[in-house]
Every structure is written in structure tokens, then in C-alpha cells.
Amino acid sequence: DLTYYTPEYQTKDTDILAAFRMTPQPGVPAEEAGAAVAAESSTGTWTTVWTDGLTTLDRYKGRCYDIEPVPGEENQYIAYVAYPLDLFEEGSVTNMFTSIVGNVFGFKALRALRLEDLRIPPAYPKTFIGPPHGIQVERDKLNKYGRPLLGCTIKPKLGLSAKNYGRAVYECLRGGLDFTKDDENVNSQPFMRWRDRFLFVAEALFKALAETGEIKGHYLNATAGTSEEMMKRARFARELGAPIVMHDYLTGGFTANTSLAFYCRDNGLLLHIHRAMHAVIDRQRNHGMHFRVLAKALRMSGGDHIHAGTVVGKLEGEREVTLGFVDLLRDDYIEKDRSRGIYFTQDWVSMPGVIPVASGGIHVWHMPALTEIFGDDAVLQFCGGTLGHPWGNAPGAVANRVALEACVQARNEGRDL
């Protein structure tokens, strides 16, 4: 049905725009594939139905308005689709994804399909709360300025008792870290129930705070099997006076995540977001969804921190692409820049920013590169890079803090990192 391919269409400021990387089956023309994507992800179905006459499809249909071949790839195209804003429920990332990526990825005429980027018009984010607090409010709450923040995931991630877990938290925070973190798989298992962990961690937080004079946090993982249980854990964290809780937003789901974000804003809790399961969705180059789309969705659904890869030691091109979605998380206005993987100019207007978290395989020798790449508004998480120190956890934390302060001072003095 080629009525969904409309190259003459002028996109509206209120449209949601999507860039899909399409690989059609052999023999299927690109225009036909692009039209099929637009139809299946909006008002179309596999046949003409008489009830189409009861609505104005021209007002509600998605339109494929541009198709460009991908240079260097055989039979691969970027298809641009515009969706009228009325197709989406206000304040629901869940509904946005159900529409745009819900069904179309299993389409027979396509060999593969990947959602590369979305342009969210300012009218739509205005219906979301977004991050519970955002970067500036977080700095004010923590009273920490002019440098990246330091974190560490407590390992071994599974198997410690609550008491020993709390001890590891205390040692890291006492040594100089700002945050420690529950691993994403730490929920409430037989060897360590969530309530016991929360209690011992709270004790560690306040002891470290009293001895260092710095505000300390531990990402208490509230992720649970039901959203009611998740809220119960968040409430208990607040009752203990903890400054921050954590959620696995992809495994926990956007609906639960947005509920938790509302609770965190109402109750002064920061919200740390882990992206467990993201590689299932974003790892394949030609099928699935790019992480920058998941990052934009999280900024709308709500979170103050999100894991965003490390950049260090990878290819240069990957560095640019990672910095592209790091900017999408932090900045108000991001210009279209294809070299950084940004297909559309994105204007967030006044929505608070999210702090990117660099985590996984980094250690103290990466500090100069990390401070240069990420700047101040980031959390640098050294897991094995703290707990793997030959002298113990606290000296590992000291090493990271000293390295960070040295790099920040060198940068401020204008030296070459």
C-alpha cells in the first residue's frame, strides 16, 4: 500500500520522527518496504477494511517521507517516518514504543529493521515528568561541584551476607567514593534479603558521612517482581533516610519506572537507572533499536543517572557516537550530526538532564581519559578497579579519589591530560 510513502510530505513541528535502518527482502523495492513500516507502525493493517471510512486516515497515518541508501551497504536504507502526535498517549513511553516498534519488526517484507533515532517534538516531553531531579538539583543535594562523581559496584555481586555487604559499602565510601551500588542482579535473594541489606547499608552510609563530612549514597536496588513490591522498597529506603534508589528500567519496564520516578520526585529521592538487557535490543547493527533511543526514552520516563558505556579503549568512531547520546542525556538542545549518530535535532526545552554513568572494565589508569571525555557531569564507576586493589577496598577508593582530584586539578590548570 504505497499511500504511506509520501516523499512530498512536509514534516510538522509536532510530528514524532523516526529513522529506521531497513534491510528489505531481495526483490522488495525500498519505497514499498518504507511504506509498509509506516503503515504497520501506525494505522495500517494487512488489508483494506471498511471501517477505514469512519476516520480520516490522512490525519492519523504514519508517513514514510524520505528514503536514503546507506553508503557502503548493499540493499540497506534509512527510512524516515513521521507520526502525528495524536497517535500517542501523553506521558507514556510504554505506549510510544508499543506503537513505533511494537509489531513492525517481525514484518515479512523486511529481512531486518533497526530504529536508529527518534525526534521527540517539544509538545510530547511536556507531558512527562522526566528525571525526578536532574543534574543541577542533584549537585545541590550532594553539595559536590566541579568534578565527576565516583562510584563502585559492590562485588562479589551475589553471595555476600547483608552485614559483610554493608562493611564493603562503608570501606569504599570512607575511602573517598561518593556512591556505591547494588549490582543489577541484587534484588532480594535467600542469602541476602532486601530489608537486611537496606539496614546495614544505611548504617554504612551514616557512619561514612559522619567520618568524612561528605554526603554519601548507595544505589539501593528497588527492582522487584511486582511494582507494588518495588514501591515498598523505595518507601523503606526513604524511611531510612537514604538519598538514592535504583531501578533496572528495561527488565522492570517503563510503566514501573515512570511510577517510581514520580515517587522519587515527590519524596526527594534520586533515581539511578541501570540498563540490564539493553544489549539484547541494541547490539545488532542492522536489527533492533540503538541505545540512543532507549536513552531518550529513559529521559522522558525518568531517571537521574543512567549507565551509558565507557568509551575508553574502543574505536574512535564509537567514541563520537557514545558522546552523541551522552549529550542527548545531558543537554537541552542537541543539533543533528550524522557523524555522531544523531539523525535529528532534539530540543528538550526545560526537561532536566540525566547524568551518564561510565561503568565496566575501567580502572584508575583510565582517569585522565575519562575526565577529558565526559567532563564534570558524569559518574565514573570503578568496580573491580576499586575492590581489586591489593591493599583492600578503602585503599582502592582512596586511589580513585586521589587520581580524580589530580586530573581535575591538572585540567583546571590547563595542562594536557
From Swiss-Prot:
SUPFAM superfamilies: RuBisCo, C-terminal domain, RuBisCO, large subunit, small (N-terminal) domain. InterPro entries: RuBisCO (IPR033966), RuBisCo_large_chain_AS (IPR020878), RuBisCO_lsu_C (IPR000685), RuBisCO_lsu_C_sf (IPR036376), RuBisCO_lsu_fd_N (IPR017443), RuBisCO_lsu_N_sf (IPR036422), RuBisCO_lsuI (IPR020888). The basic functional RuBisCO is composed of a large chain homodimer in a 'head-to-tail' conformation. In form I RuBisCO this homodimer is arranged in a barrel-like tetramer with the small subunits forming a tetrameric 'cap' on each end of the 'barrel'. Heterohexadecamer of 8 large chains and 8 small chains. The active site is at K155 (proton acceptor), H274 (proton acceptor). The record marks K314 as: Transition state stabilizer. It holds the Pfam family RuBisCO_large. Mg(2+) binds at K181, D183, E184. Its EC number is 4.1.1.39. Disulfide bonds: none annotated. Belongs to the RuBisCO large chain family. Type I subfamily. Its main location: plastid. PROSITE patterns: RUBISCO_LARGE. Keywords: Calvin cycle, Carbon dioxide fixation, Chloroplast, Lyase, Magnesium, Metal-binding, Monooxygenase, Oxidoreductase, Photorespiration, Photosynthesis, Plastid. Binds 1 Mg(2+) ion per subunit. GO terms for cellular component: chloroplast. It is found in: Plastid, Chloroplast. Substrate binds at N103, T153, K157, R275, H307, S359. Its cofactor is Mg(2+). This is Ribulose bisphosphate carboxylase large chain.
